[in-house]
Amino acid sequence: EASLGVTLFERSAKGMFPTPDGEVFVRYAKTVLKQVDAIENMFSGDHAAKTQFSISVPRASYIADAFAKFSKLIEKGTDAELFYKETNALRAIKNLLNDEFKLGIVRYAESFDKYYKNMMDEKGLEYELIAEFRYKLLFHKDSPLAQMDEVTYDDLRDLVMIAHADPYVPSLPFSEVKKEELPDNSDRKILVFERASQFELLAENHETFMWSSPIPRPLLERYGLAQRYCRDNKRVYKDVLIHRKDYTLSEIDNMFIEELVKAKRETFGEEM
């Protein structure tokens, strides 16, 4: 700190925390250390370059579909590691800042656009809109909702809502985030962290439903599910691709992004 002439850490009885300058310093220090490791590996006799891909994403089926198709593009004999983590928006951003993942996709309600863009600008992140959409109701084809010509919030009151348990928006109370992210019109709720479990629940318990971005048709057919808009829910959501400004997209990154755009077009169709 003395040689740099800046304060990198704030010290108190509760511990030591990085200042904004400290966060930048730590981020670049990690990058330098990784580059040193890469140079050491280059001249240690292990010359085979390993292909790596890493991304943090929301629990979205069209994104998972894109990743599955992307994985088939990795040629046999390639030394490759692919990391795919489903998590909330804040953790996706932290994974980039900590240099644990190279890419991220964050999902948030349009009303929080300013909060996220301000934070990403402050943290030195590039961002690009992938999709803009309204949530649909997702339910089994034998659900009471399937028989209705039009669905309202009141129709959901006696059903069981499945929701992801960890929405998060910086600088806002959690109660406000839940109110905006999760329309709360059901007395019974099941909170899940794993996307796979939601499909098992929807297929087995026909009184369940959840709010979801558009789902690929093959997945709907596999679990006997259907989707429909709710007349009362007009909220718009965004999926945004992010990466650090000091990171250059690799060939494998662009391969995934190409599959992501294809999956979005196939799944969203005329809703785009």
Indicate residue ranges for each PLM-predicted region.
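Central regulatory/effector-binding core of bacterial HTH transcription factors
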Residues: 50-116
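Secondary-structure junction motif
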Residues: 63-69, 113, 145, 149, ...
